[in-house]
Amino acid sequence: MEVLKRENPLIHMITNYVTVNDLAQVTINYGGLPLMATHHDELKEITKMANGLLVNIGTLEPYQMESSMISMKIAKEKGIPSVLDPVGVQASKLRKDFAKKLILEGEPSLIKGNLAEIKTLIGETSNSIGIDSFDDSLSENTKNKIKEYARERNLIVVVSGVVDFITNGEESASVKNGTYKMSKITGTGCMLGALLTLALSFYDHKDLRFKEVVKAVSTWGICGELAEERLREKEGLMTFKHNLLDELSIINDETIKEREKVIYD
C-alpha cells in the first residue's frame, strides 16, 4: 500500500505567550499551517479539523488550562496526534499536577521536555532553577525509566539536551546534532515542540511517526549548526536566531542526510 505524506498539515497550538509567534513561524517554515485557538466556543470545531495538536504549559492561566484539557480529550477521541510540552513542570505544584492530569486524561502521543522536566514526570529529582534545567547527563538508569514510562503509556518521549534522547519504549535513538547557542535563545525548545507535532501529523501510520520524530529532532539541531556557521564577526544571538529560522525554511533532505548524527539503540 502506498503511503502518502500529508502536505501542509494544520496544527492547532495552545501555547505560551512568550514564544507564540516563533511557533507559528517554524510551523510554516517546516511545511505546516499554524492555528492558535483557546476560546471554548470554537475549540471543538478547531481541534476536530486539525491534523495535530500541541499543548504547551509555559504560561498557565485558568482559561487556557481548561482549553488545553478540552482539546487534548477531543484529540484523544478523534485519534488526532497530540504533543505535550510540560514547560517548567518542575517549577511548581500547579504545573506538575496539571501536566500529570493532561497525561492521564488526554493521553498525548508524545511528551517533549528537557531532562529536568522529564525526570520530574518519571518521579526523579531534577537539578533546576525555575523552568531552566541544569541536568546535563542522562544515566542508563534514567534512560531505562524513561523507556518504561513511554512503553506503559504508549507514547513517544523526547528528551532535549546536549544529546537528545527519543524513545517509544521499544525503539530508542540518540541525536548529537545542535549547538550550545540554541540553549541561549528563548523558545528553541518550544519551537521543537511545534516541529514534533508536525512530524506526527505528516503520516497517519504510527510506525512511520517514530522516524519522523527523530528526523525532526536532528533537523532542528542541524539548522542550529548551519545558523552558527553563518555568523560573522560581531554578530550575536539575535542574528543567530534569525539564521536558525532561515535555515529551517531552506533545509533539504540531502543536507539532513549528510549531517545527521543519529544513533539507534
UniProtKB/Swiss-Prot annotation:
Pathway: Cofactor biosynthesis; thiamine diphosphate biosynthesis; 4-methyl-5-(2-phosphoethyl)-thiazole from 5-(2-hydroxyethyl)-4-methylthiazole: step 1/1. NCBIfam families: PRK09355.1 (NF006830). Its cofactor is Mg(2+). SUPFAM superfamilies: Ribokinase-like. It is an enzyme of class 2 (transferase). GO terms for biological process: thiamine biosynthetic process; thiamine diphosphate biosynthetic process. Pfam families: HK (PF02110). This is Hydroxyethylthiazole kinase. GO terms for molecular function: ATP binding; hydroxyethylthiazole kinase activity; magnesium ion binding. ATP binds at residues 112, 160. Belongs to the Thz kinase family. The keyword Thylakoid does not apply. InterPro entries: Hyethyz_kinase (IPR000417), Ribokinase-like (IPR029056).
